[in-house]
């Protein structure tokens, strides 16, 4: 999982917990746009096509 930055891992953990971008932004004190960009980078780096796939990946990786 070293391919993801620490902040991307934080975002992925919250995505896997079912949090919305707005909720993640508030929790991590980021803009919604920044959360959106982190999620886009996560999808690209992990070669995934959806938020649901990212959430499943996070669960399998033990983030939740």
Stretches found by the model and what they are:
Residues 1-40, 45, 53, 60-61:
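Helix-turn-helix DNA-binding segment
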């Amino acid at each position: 999982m070293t391919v993801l930055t620490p902040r991307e891992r934080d975002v992925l953990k919250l995505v896997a917990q079912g949090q919305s971008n707005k909720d993640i932004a508030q929790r991590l004190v980021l803009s919604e746009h920044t959360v959106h960009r982190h999620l886009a980078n996560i999808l690209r780096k992990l070669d995934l096509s959806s938020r649901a796939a990212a959430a499943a990946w996070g669960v399998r990786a033990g983030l939740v």
